[in-house]
């Protein structure tokens, strides 16, 4: 009897945790589905790449290295261009 009283809540807790994990996994797979690109994010990345590469070229023409401070928000200066980290 005592074993049954312990087993029922334990099984219920495991079931709830398993269901929650399955729902999270399904949500992640839908977000990462191939063929559904985030075009707005790609446009921002493209603009940032152009903007940073132009600013790096301006710095290079002045015989100075690219300012690393120009590249922010997950970007770093590499090969005289800002690239996404």
Curated annotation (Swiss-Prot):
Record keyword Secreted present: yes
UniProt xrefs under PROSITE patterns: HWTX_2
Tissue spec: Expressed by the venom gland.
Statement: the UniProt record of this protein carries the keyword Signal: yes
Main location: secreted
S-S pairs: 52-66, 56-77, 71-82
CC per GO annotation: extracellular region; host cell postsynaptic membrane
UniProt propeptide residues: 23-48
Molecular functions per Gene Ontology: toxin activity
Cleaved signal peptide residues: 1-22
Coiled coil: none
Location of the protein in the cell: Secreted
Pfam families: Toxin_20
Recorded superkingdom: Eukaryota
UniProt KW keywords: Disulfide bond, Neurotoxin, Postsynaptic neurotoxin, Secreted, Signal, Toxin
Family: Belongs to the neurotoxin 12 (Hwtx-2) family. 02 (Hwtx-2) subfamily.
Function: Postsynaptic neurotoxin.
Protein name per UniProt: U4-theraphotoxin-Hhn1p
